[in-house]
Structure formats: C-alpha cells, structure tokens
C-alpha cells in the first residue's frame, strides 16, 4: 500500500468537518499593543485558548479518528515534549482508547500532569530520554513490539491536515471582518503546523507571506531547507523552547515547507523570554516559549510590516510557573540588563562599602553576592550579580569593575559558568 505523503486543501476541509464539534474555535484578535508598537495591524490567533491550550489537539484528534476500528482496538502511542501528548491524551479519553505516551524526562512537570489529567485512566505516561528525538526512538521501538499505532506529532499527513484546520478557521474569521493578511508568522518545531497552515494559505490567501519562526538553538527546518537542501539532524540543540526544540524535522513537512514557506527567522531564546514577559505584563497572555515565537519574530520584520496587516499564531500556553525565574534571567541577559562577575575581594573591613561606593552606579542594584573567605590569603572570591537600569551603562560598569579587579571574570560571556547560575 502506498503511503500518502502530500496534503491538499481537500484533506484539510475534511479534517475541519471531523473536528467541528471537537475543537474550540479560538479567537482571532486585533492586538492594540503590538499594532501600536510596530505601526501596523497585528492579529493574534489564540490557540493558547484551545481545550488543551495548544493547536496540537487538531492534528492529534484528526490522525486518531481516521484509524480503523481494528487499529483503534490495539491502542495508540506517541512521543511528545508536551502539547501533542495532551492532544493524544484528550482524544484517547474522548474515544475511550488505550494510549501509551512517551515524553522526555526534561518535560516541564506542568505538561506531564496535564497529560495525565486529560487522559485519566486511558493513558500511561513514560518519561524517557533527554530530548524529543531520544524519546521518539523509544516510542517507536515500543510501538513495534506491542503492535500499536504510533501517532506522529508532525510527520503524518493526517496530523498536518488537522493542524491546517487552524488556517481554514482563521481565514473564515478574517473574511467575516473583511481582513486580508500580508504576513503570517508561525512557529516551527517538527513542521506540522507550518505545513498545514501554508498549504491552505497558498491556495486561499496566496499573497500572504508565510514566515516560519524557529528558536536559534534548534533551527532544524532552516538548516535543512535553506542551508543543506535536505533533511539533516542537528547534532546539538538548545532545549529551552521545548515545544519547538526538534533536532530533525519530518520528511513530509520538509517537502511542504520547502515549497510553501517564504522565509525563516531564527529568534534568540532570550528574545523569546522577553516576549513572554511582555505578553504577560502588557496583554495578560500566558504564552509558553514556543507560543511566543511568532510574536518574537516581529522585531526582525519591523521595517517590512510597517503599515501592513499581520497575523501571529500563539500556538500554545502551557507554561510552567516554575520556569519563570529562568525566563526572567534569560530575558535580562538578552536585554543586557543583568551582569555577573567573579572578583578577588580584599579580606578587610570596609571592602564591600568601597566596592559599593566606587563600582556601583547610582541606579545599579546588587542581585547576587556570594563570598568565599580564604583564611590564608589577602583576598577572597566573590560572585556578584549587578542589575542595571539601562543597558548603555554596561561599558562604564565594566571599566569600574576592571579598575577594582583587573583579573575579574565576566560570567555573561562564559556560557558554561553562566549556566551554573540559572
């Protein structure tokens, strides 16, 4: 039997009918803050408000619902960093199927607990591997040994068709408001979302520029399509944007993206953190890192989108509150507002007061101070964190620190040392 490897608008239309009474029609909202910031009209497609707080339910339910009754009776499996797993769990409960869900051990606890909540007694969760790709290998082995049905998170035409229903829904909403999009920004992990969306947009909104957004530490689609012209596996990835940190995209999604995506943007993980905080404080939107990717890319395109109409897909809102400290730290590092140094500190009374008076600026704040006293030496080692009010103050701060201790170590430039602090 020939395996289907292409997706058509007809496939998406059929998926739309299957999902009509299953998924929530999420809002398409004009965002006044972003529109004012970038001097254009910015709409947000709020998939963070979906039943499982991400678009993944669309693809998971569609892929599972097309299985035969015999296949369904054998049970289903999947591998996921979180959101696809929640979609599969929700579907397993809805259709009363047995599911074994494999998740990386690095998956935020919030996502693991949500999978168990949505699936209840229909779902068994297995935590294995440090990355999605390691987790995937375990899931495929288990699926083969137990003759179950693997529900691919992105490299499956039914999954892609399900994700594509988001585009159909979005264009119908835009049409009712007499809106035409000049640009669409959407996150890329394995490529299922961008493949489904771009397939529908190229037929029904061909003048819309499709921009795929990846974290700079896991830009597997860009490296495959643009740099190598073939699917490649990244040897190392930054797992921070966990919903979009995939070392290897799908063969099917690669071909669709290569044909449909107009451009790719790589966004620094620190910029994503700044966007998460900005969206929460300015718009009261709780976005996970992958969910904030599309909005993060607007800064790269601010000259292109001026006066245009733009839509960003907020793909997910499953953020673990326990990660907020790290998110704030990464944002401050990216914005050049917080800086860490290792200093040799004089071991005499009044040394700290001298440091505060001579080194700190009037608006600088000490956020970390760890002192290791050495009884046999004249100096002790200090790790100090300083937060600025303005990143332009950094040059003068460094000059004062160098005068205080010419042998100081600036930790921000040393990824290994910095990783020990957050």
Swiss-Prot record:
Task: Name the positions where pyridoxal 5'-phosphate binds.
Answer: 83, 189-193, 315
- Nucleus listed as a keyword: no
Q: Give the similarity note.
A: Belongs to the serine/threonine dehydratase family.
Could you tell me what this protein is called? L-threonine dehydratase biosynthetic IlvA
* GO-annotated biological processes: isoleucine biosynthetic process; L-serine catabolic process; threonine catabolic process; threonine metabolic process
| Catalysed reactions, semicolon-separated | L-threonine = 2-oxobutanoate + NH4(+)
Q: Which residues carry this modification: N6-(pyridoxal phosphate)lysine?
A: 56
Cofactor(s) needed by this chain: pyridoxal 5'-phosphate
**What UniProt keywords apply to this chain's record, in alphabetical order?**
Amino-acid biosynthesis, Branched-chain amino acid biosynthesis, Isoleucine biosynthesis, Lyase, Pyridoxal phosphate
Look up the EC number in the record and give it.
4.3.1.19
UniProt pathway annotation: Amino-acid biosynthesis; L-isoleucine biosynthesis; 2-oxobutanoate from L-threonine: step 1/1
Q: Name one GO molecular function term.
A: pyridoxal phosphate binding
PROSITE patterns recorded for this chain? Answer: ACT_LIKE (PS51672), DEHYDRATASE_SER_THR (PS00165)
Q: What class of enzyme is it?
A: lyase
InterPro entries from the xrefs?
Answer: ACT-like_dom_sf, IlvA, Ser/Thr_Dehydratase, Ser/Thr_deHydtase_PyrdxlP-BS, TD_ACT-like, TD_ACT-like_sf, TrpB-like_PALP, TrpB-like_PALP_sf
Q: What does this protein do?
A: Catalyzes the anaerobic formation of alpha-ketobutyrate and ammonia from threonine in a two-step reaction. The first step involved a dehydration of threonine and a production of enamine intermediates (aminocrotonate), which tautomerizes to its imine form (iminobutyrate). Both intermediates are unstable and short-lived. The second step is the nonenzymatic hydrolysis of the enamine/imine intermediates to form 2-ketobutyrate and free ammonia. In the low water environment of the cell, the second step is accelerated by RidA.
* Subunit note: Homotetramer.
Q: Which residues cross the membrane?
A: none
The record places domain ACT-like at: 339-413
Question: Keyword Amino-acid biosynthesis: yes or no?
Answer: yes
């Amino acid at each position: 039997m020939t395996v289907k490897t292409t997706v058509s608008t007809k496939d998406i239309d059929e998926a739309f009918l299957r999902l009509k009474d299953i998924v929530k029609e999420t809002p398409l909202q004009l965002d006044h803050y972003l529109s004012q910031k970038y001097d254009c009209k910015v709409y947000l497609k709020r998939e963070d408000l979906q039943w499982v707080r991400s678009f993944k339910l669309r693809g998971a339910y569609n892929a599972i619902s097309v299985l035969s009754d015999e296949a369904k009776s054998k049970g289903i499996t999947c591998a996921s960093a979180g959101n696809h797993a929640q979609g599969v769990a929700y579907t397993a409960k809805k259709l009363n199927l047995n599911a074994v869900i494999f998740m990386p051990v690095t998956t935020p606890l919030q996502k693991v607990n949500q999978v168990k909540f949505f699936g209840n007694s229909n779902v068994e969760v297995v935590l294995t591997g440090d990355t999605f790709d390691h987790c995937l290998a375990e899931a495929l082995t288990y699926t083969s040994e137990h003759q179950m049905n693997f529900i691919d998170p992105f490299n499956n035409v039914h999954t892609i068709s399900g994700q594509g229903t988001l585009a159909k829904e979005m264009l119908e909403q835009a049409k009712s408001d007499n809106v035409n999009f000049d640009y669409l920004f959407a996150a890329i992990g394995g490529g299922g979302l961008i493949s489904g969306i771009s397939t529908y947009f190229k037929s029904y909104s061909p003048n819309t520029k499709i921009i795929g957004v990846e974290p700079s530490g896991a830009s597997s689609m860009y490296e495959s399509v643009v740099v190598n012209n073939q699917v490649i596996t990244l040897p190392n990835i930054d797992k921070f944007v966990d919903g979009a940190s995939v070392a290897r995209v799908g063969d099917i999604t690669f071909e669709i993206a290569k044909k449909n995506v107009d451009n790719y943007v790589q966004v620094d993980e620190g910029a994503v953190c700044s966007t998460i905080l900005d969206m929460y404080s300015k718009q009261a939107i709780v976005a996970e890192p992958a969910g904030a990717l599309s909005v993060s890319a607007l800064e790269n395109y601010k000259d292109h989108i001026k006066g245009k109409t733009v839509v960003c897909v907020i793909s997910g809102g499953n953020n673990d509150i326990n990660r907020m400290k790290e998110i704030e730290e990464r944002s401050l590092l990216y914005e050049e507002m917080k800086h860490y140094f290792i200093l040799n500190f004089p071991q005499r009374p009044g040394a700290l007061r001298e440091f505060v008076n001579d080194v700190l600026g009037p608006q600088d704040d000490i956020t970390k101070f760890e002192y290791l006293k050495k009884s046999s030496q004249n100096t002790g080692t200090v790790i100090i964190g300083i937060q600025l009010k303005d990143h332009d103050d950094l040059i003068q701060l460094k000059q004062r620190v160098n005068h205080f201790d010419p042998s100081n170590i600036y930790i921000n430039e040393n990824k290994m040392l910095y990783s020990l602090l957050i």
